Amino acid sequence: MRYLFVGDTHGPTDLGKLRSPEVAALKLGARDAIIHCGDFGAPWRQDMDEVLGFWRQVPAKVLICLGNHENYGWIMRQPVTRRYGCQGYDLGGKLFAPLPGQTATLGGRRFWFYPGGFSIDFFLRQTGVDLFGDELLTGEQAAAVMADYFRRQVPDYIISHDAPRSFILKHFGFPIRLPPDAYYAHTGERTGSRAHPAFTLDPIYLARRYNKWYFGHHHKDYEAENLRCLYRQMVLEDSLTGETRIISPAG
């Protein structure tokens, strides 16, 4: 089985990499899977659009780790079903978004999903239209997910949208901070009620309790310490041959 790991596509904005000749040449089919690291962004501001139609026609399985630029108002109305040994949202076609902390099994490999991200541009967005409090788990949800993670065997892959805070500070030099009070005033949420994923995921990184880790959100292509940030580049892995390839669309 082949897995194509993909970073942010933001609806149509960064979808070109999936429509590139380099991806077409892979001839991904029903036995393959695309693992999307979030900011899927389809549909956007409505219940159906051309981008969602594109994704629903993809022949490969598509598993989405939801980000912050998502239409949560629509997503959370979709049916929750069981697929690949875990619970998630059925988004139509072969699109599936695992719930937080769920582990999907594909081709004998185990993928643990932690969705969500903080929209630093929240003040430019309209709550309930292109900004949703559900982009972040509640503190209680995050604590339960993490407690469950540390009780279980380490998965083959962690798939998240954001990355551990300590990793980002060390490698990108960016000191991630908690959402400010203004964020909660803007979203109508209780101050401090939501968990920033970079802080939540940090204990996993600091304990080195992971094998491979893919994430997006930071709009970089970068790899260190078995963590890889995806944006323009994609990664193809083959579970049978063990081959790993970097897919870099031209232009």
Residue ranges and their predicted role:
Residues 1-4, 102-113, 157, 224-229:
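Beta-strand-turn-beta hairpins that frame and shape the catalytic cleft
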Residues 9-10, 40-41, 68-71, 117-118, ...:
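Catalytic metal-binding/acid-base residues of hydrolase active sites
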Residues 15-16, 45-47, 74-77, 162, ...:
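A short acidic (Asp/Glu
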Residues 107-196:
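Active-site-proximal loop/helix segment associated with metal-binding centers of metalloenzymes
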